[in-house]
Amino acid sequence: MAISPKSEDYQKFDYSLLLNGLKEGVKDLSPAYFAMVMATGIISIAAHLLGMPLVSITLFWLNIVTYLVLWFLNVLRVVWFTSQFFSDMVDHKRGPGFFTSIAGSCVLGSQFVLISGNFLAATFLWILGIILWIGLTYTIFTAFTIKENKPSLDE
């Protein structure tokens, strides 16, 4: 005789706690987190060039997951905290961190070419890197230039 639990024996999971925790974590997400993709990719490429395929491939897959998660979190940040996201973009301290998304995209593209031979994914990431580079360079540096209140050089 099998014992089957009744539905009232289980508490319903409160998804609002999970959603609020995600929102709180995304709110102040640093744009410089793509530096993790850069660094992981560089180590993965070095391992590949040194003939360590297990390390190289493991870091390559870790990098793909990290890259996708970071883009997902940044899209959520744009949706939920639009003004804070764009305020960070023109902030003298946090703005330059956005450039790590360019380098991270291009390093991951290099991994796709060297480790998996996937030129299509690499080309997509290269084009994305160019678009991000043009967009971020002109947005961030224009904002820095025309901003009335600029920090001093020692800040």
PLM regions with names:
Residues 44, 73-76, 139-142:
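Residue-level signal for alpha-helical transmembrane segments in multi-pass membrane proteins
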Residues 53-120:
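Membrane helical hairpin/interfacial module
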Residues 59-65, 124-131, 155:
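Physicochemical signature of membrane-embedded alpha-helices that form the seven-helix bundle of GPCRs
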Residues 110-144:
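A generic, well-ordered mixed alpha/beta core segment in the N-terminal half of proteins
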